């Protein structure tokens, strides 16, 4: 069995003291809150009861096979603009995402939305697959939702690829595209997705998207993690939850602290769940970045296994830089969020 190691540091809400390290082994407005409770999403007062585990929970083997109760995958097309000339809007592009709808999707209910970005040398099909050829992450969602481990949600797999499907294979280009991606994400993708499907956004204006940020998450592994950090940097007003793994951070702790201060958000307005593997080539830089946030005395990053007491948590495996471990990190984040 693969050994999974957790770096678990628990602090009370924004305690200024440096936490001890322990390791263990094992592979809203009122209306929105009421709607959330009716759909099984916890209210603010319930969040403290939902804690991350002390170590990463392995994905059951059966979750990699087809479930009896299956959600659906849909091809989703939307219009946007070429990344580097985005502000000029001189080159229109039609782009594609894969959208997962949970089993029993009901337009009379509202669903939180989980945006999942691929890494390098990849595309929007990498994790969920396609409607005709679903991949393992789709099966994991189906089983987790059916067994009550994962909250029913909409999952969107877009791409930062720009004018070519090969863009993600160029490392320096991919870095630039993930830094620019927030333009397309906020102005084009979210309004298109959340204007079509039943979410917590009352409409697709920037104000409504910001008002529904508690029910929106961004996640990614490797270059998708870089996109996640950039989303935190550029789009904190529109997302509450961020799940980077094995990539970045894309900027310094001081930069992120300035982002938080400038946004007007407090320490309890967001949550970051981060993960990596000790045999991952990105491990050292990634963990150093998390440690810098954890050790900051600004009071803006608070390490805890739940969002009532903090806004930052980190778990690690002994894994390498591979899709197997990416799905492990995603699964653990999905089992916690909105529960």
Task: Identify the residue ranges that each predicted region occupies.
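C-terminal motif of bacterial Sec signal peptides marking the signal peptidase cleavage site
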Residues: 10-13
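Non-catalytic cap/lid and distal C-terminal segments of serine-dependent acyl enzymes
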Residues: 20-339
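Bacterial signal peptide processing site
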Residues: 15-17
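Bacterial N-terminal signal peptides
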Residues: 2-8
């Amino acid at each position: 069995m693969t050994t999974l190691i957790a770096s678990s540091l628990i602090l009370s809400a924004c305690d200024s003291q440096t936490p001890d390290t322990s390791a263990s082994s094992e592979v809203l407005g009122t209306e929105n809150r009421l709607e959330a409770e009716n759909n099984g999403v916890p209210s603010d007062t319930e969040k403290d009861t939902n804690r991350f585990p002390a170590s990463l929970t392995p994905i059951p083997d059966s979750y990699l096979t087809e479930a009896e109760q299956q959600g659906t995958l849909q091809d989703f097309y939307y219009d946007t603009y070429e990344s580097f000339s985005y502000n000029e809007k001189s080159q229109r592009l039609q782009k594609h995402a894969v959208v997962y709808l949970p089993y029993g999707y009901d337009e009379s209910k509202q669903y939180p939305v989980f945006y999942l970005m691929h890494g390098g040398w990849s595309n929007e099909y990498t994790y969920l697959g396609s409607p005709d050829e679903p991949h393992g992450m789709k099966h994991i969602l189906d089983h987790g939702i059916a067994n009550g481990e994962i909250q029913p949600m909409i999952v969107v797999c877009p791409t930062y690829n720009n004018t070519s499907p090969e863009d993600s294979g160029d490392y320096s280009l991919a870095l630039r595209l993930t830094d620019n991606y927030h333009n397309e994400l906020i102005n084009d993708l979210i309004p298109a997705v959340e204007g079509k499907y039943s979410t917590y956004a009352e409409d697709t204006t920037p104000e409504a998207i910001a008002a529904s940020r508690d029910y929106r998450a961004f996640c990614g592994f490797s270059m998708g993690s870089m996109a996640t950090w950039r989303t935190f940097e550029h789009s904190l007003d529109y997302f509450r939850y961020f799940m980077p793994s094995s990539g970045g951070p894309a900027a310094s702790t001081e930069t992120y602290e300035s982002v938080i201060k400038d946004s007007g958000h407090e320490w309890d307005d967001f949550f970051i769940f981060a993960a990596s593997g000790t045999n991952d080539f990105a491990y050292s830089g990634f963990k150093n970045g998390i440690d810098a946030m954890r050790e900051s005395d600004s009071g803006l990053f608070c390490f805890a296994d739940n969002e009532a007491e903090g806004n930052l948590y980190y778990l690690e495996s002994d894994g390498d830089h591979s899709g197997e471990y990416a799905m492990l990190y995603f699964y653990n984040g999905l089992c916690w969020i909105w529960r």
